[in-house]
Amino acid sequence: RDRSVSRGLGDVYKRQGLVVVDTGSYWSAFGQAVILLLIQTGGLGVITVVASFSMVSGRKISLMQRSTMQDAISAPKVGGIVRLTKFILQGTFLIELIGAILMLPVFCRDYGWKGIWMSVFHSVSAFCNAGFDILGTTEQTFPSLTGYIANPLINLVIMLLIVIGGIGFLTWDDFCTNKWNLKRYRLQSKIILVTTAVLILLPAIFFFLSDFAGFSMGKRILASFFQSVTLRTAGFNTADLGAMNDSSKAIMILMMLIGGSPGSTAGGMKTTTIAVLILNAFATFGREPETEVFGRRFDNTVVKNAATIAILYFFLFFAGGIAISQIEHVALSDC
């Protein structure tokens, strides 16, 4: 039991959302607060959190620390990294606060004063792409957000929090600096936004056509988009994923491998990696000498790095699945 709990806490910190006990019914209020703190730390990153303490205490941040912060948030340069870190911290807490306030009417209606804690917890969990929920009871464990499958407010707020947290801090910076003038965005931000939109829209359309046939039109649209948004990085669900068809599950596996974007609260192979590989494939088929997008050419090193990351991810994915299948004596498709 102790080992199970420690594994669960590890998943909290690593933003995976996997649990061995129901978070809502198993843990006390203090335990849930610790989990929330770990989710927030994992979402922002240890380096960002440590740097924030240094800034609050008035300590000078060394060049080496600035370089580490640059790597942690995938910033293009060391210059302005402290300003960017402050922007990330302020933006994070503001967005999480807005998300919590928007969900208050629904959760307070259903849970009374406890709804305040529910709103805060799920706002942070969604923004940090953790996928943890505290809606479980001793009678119904691991419900996730299935009770709110037809609630537009909860669906839309959670989806927006997941997407905003998953597109990366530099993309926020571009939006706040350049507003809707997309031409002035960094190349990375442009790729992230286009890839994210495609990776949300295409699976949602597939789910809409292949699953949820018994739902009303509005409920079906919400369920399709919610599952598409959450499966890549977060881990919430409003529908019974086990009841979805095998083709949908295969798409889910691929989307989970891709994950979120660089410098974000999400994990995975990253949207930019898959985008570079697809663009390089099109360039190869078109017999183009170099990979180009938005008028910019990729260095061959970028393409090689993307291919290396993808190969490593797929190797670890299959190796992990085979290992679990052999150890637990279950079908490989269930791993």
Enumerate the predicted regions with their spans.
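Membrane-proximal intracellular helices of multi-pass ion channels
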Residues: 1-335
